[in-house]
Every structure is written in C-alpha cells, then in structure tokens.
Swiss-Prot record:
Function: Component of the Mediator complex, a coactivator involved in the regulated transcription of nearly all RNA polymerase II-dependent genes. Mediator functions as a bridge to convey information from gene-specific regulatory proteins to the basal RNA polymerase II transcription machinery. Mediator is recruited to promoters by direct interactions with regulatory proteins and serves as a scaffold for the assembly of a functional preinitiation complex with RNA polymerase II and the general transcription factors.
A Pfam family hit: Med30
Family the entry assigns: Belongs to the Mediator complex subunit 30 family.
Entry keyword ATP-binding: no
Span list, region Disordered: 1-22
Modified residues (N-acetylserine): 2
Name this polypeptide is given: Mediator of RNA polymerase II transcription subunit 30
Length: 178
C-alpha cells in the first residue's frame, strides 16, 4: 500500500524526485514501520482519552438549560476526534499489513530458543544445551572482570589514601615552618 511521495501543491519537484527516491519511499524498513505503528497506537490512546474527557465534561440534557454554542462546540470536537480516531485505526491497519507482508518470508523462532537457560538438566532438549553453557560462561567472565575491577578500585583507594596522608604531612611541615 505504498505510494510515491507527492510534491506539495504549487512547488516544483525536488532534486530527489527521480525513480530512486520513489523506490526508496516504497521500500520502508520494517523497524521504521514498527516505530510508526507505535506512534499511531500512542495517538489512538491520546485521542481516546480526549474523547472520554469530552464525554465526561458533557452535560446530559436532563431539563437543565445549557448553552447550545458550548454544546455544539463540544459535539464538533467529539465528532472530529472520532473521525481522526477512525483514520488512525485505518493507518494502523495499513502499517500492520505492511509489517506482516515484509516479515512473511521469515521463519518464526520459538521463544524458548531465544532465552538462554542456566539450568543444566538432562531433561531439556540437546539443541538447547549450547545457550546455557554460553550464559554460564558469560556470567563467569563477568564475575571475573568484576572481581578484578574491585581489586583495582581497592588499590586506587589505597594510593589515594597514601597521597592524602602525604599531602597532609607536607602541609603540616609547611605550617610549622612559618
């Protein structure tokens, strides 16, 4: 459902209006589509909240006189928000369809294979035996690096304490000299 970008009315097409620009506009990155979809969902939530706010603030015609101008203004805002909400849902449907079209050739990977397990049970499948070892090796390496980092920090602290004491002694000698 991609269409080439249209030039603004009354403006000449820019230098990028050639076939390459149109081809680039047609080939939209799936991640960009997902971002657009996320923004569209956020807009839908915002518009829905506005609709509920308008409905909450509207007075019911229960025999009380109300300003018809205010009522008409709120009614037009409500209708406008409903129209925009409908447009946003259509846009979200287009983005969803395009994402499914782009990801149609991909083989879905089971979630269990994406999560590295730490357990070393014999009951698990052999094809998942690699990730637990990788996760445990990575944790061991991180622990070693953290241990070395703590040792270096301790050494630096000792050096700073020694320098502080040395500066204190020098300042004391200079003070006694004067």
């Amino acid at each position: 459902m991609s269409t080439p970008p249209l030039a603004a009315s009354g403006m000449a097409p820019g230098p990028f209006a050639g076939p390459q620009a149109q081809q680039a506009a047609r080939e939209v990155n799936t991640a960009s589509l997902c971002r657009i979809g996320q923004e569209t969902v956020q807009d839908i939530v915002y518009r829905t909240m506005e609709i509920f706010q308008l409905l909450r603030n509207m007075q019911l015609p229960n025999g009380v006189t109300y300003h018809t101008g205010t009522y008409q203004d709120r009614l037009t805002k409500l209708q406008d928000n409903l129209r925009q909400l409908s447009v946003l849902f259509r846009k979200l449907r287009l983005v969803y369809d395009k994402c499914n079209e782009n990801c149609g050739g991909m083989d879905p990977i089971p979630v269990e294979q994406l999560i590295p397990y730490v357990e070393e049970d014999g009951s698990k499948n052999d094809d998942r035996a690699g990730p637990p070892r990788f996760a445990s090796e990575e944790r061991r390496e991180i622990a070693e690096v953290n241990k070395k980092l703590k040792q270096k920090n301790q050494q630096l602290k000792q050096i700073m304490d020694q320098l502080r004491n040395l500066i204190w002694d020098i300042n004391a000698m200079l003070a006694m000299r004067n």
